[in-house]
Amino acid sequence: MSSKNFMVFSGTATRYLAERICQHLGCPLGNSVITKFSDGEFAISYEESIRGRDIFLVQSTFPNSDNMMELLLLIDAAKRAAAKTINAVIPYFGWARQYRKDKPRVSIGAKLIADLLSVAGVDRVITMDLHADQIQGFFDVPVDHLYGSGVILPYLKRLNIDDLVIASPDVGGSKRANTYAKYLGCPLVLCNKTRERANEVASMQIIGDVKGKNVVIIDDMVDTAGTITKAADIMKAAGAKTVRACASHCVMSGPASDRVQNSALEEIVFTDSIPYSNRCAKVKQLSVAEMFAETIRRVLDNESISSQYLV
């Protein structure tokens, strides 16, 4: 892999992660300028030649929508500057929960975002823990889908937890949690929840035994933390010795930090796909920079990506 043939650039949302990725790749972060105007619009420019280069653009697309618009403009500018290939590295893919038409007269946001990226000129997407695997099929370009388990599972192994039980906070996440349980060689329990409205859990029941166990709840993301904290409190009340949680994406919006801090959770472990500034003492973040750097290296060297997946 020659650093002369590729360059890494970043939007403003995840510059910290792009810098760490570059450290692992042994290359400098490319020089781009994002100028924001008084009316809220912004313009993108590359301050060095990218002609004929393989370009990797690191940008998570968590709210607000400016982060997605930045990425689209970065792609467009790279295409117009004659980059050889344009690879969008999107650690957290926003709008992924809008992946199906679950009621009449609604949009399918994930499909629209995939179309926008393709029209802008992206050649490849590298992302992590999509809310629904089928979103990969929304794209007309290759998608390398990584998993946060690549850093979370080794962390759990190092803890060497006795009487371990893996839990899924809902039936929909049972496949993900079951993979963790198989890898760690421990039982799986499920939570069955019902919602009255978005971000609000009406009721929840445990399917399985947690009495005297150390429970780790597995999810893909935590938004308002209503589900994960309710599950932790119910499991603690059912006799669990300790309750932890692990999720790839630290959305943590609204009351999430207070809910986690005041819950039965001992800790909640995320990756650094999204920056977290509201410092809740129970939140820990593990870096996925090395995993993304290794994926970029394999893309450049035409090596298998799937062989590094743990889930």
Model-derived regions, located:
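PRPP-associated nucleotide enzymes
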Residues: 1-311
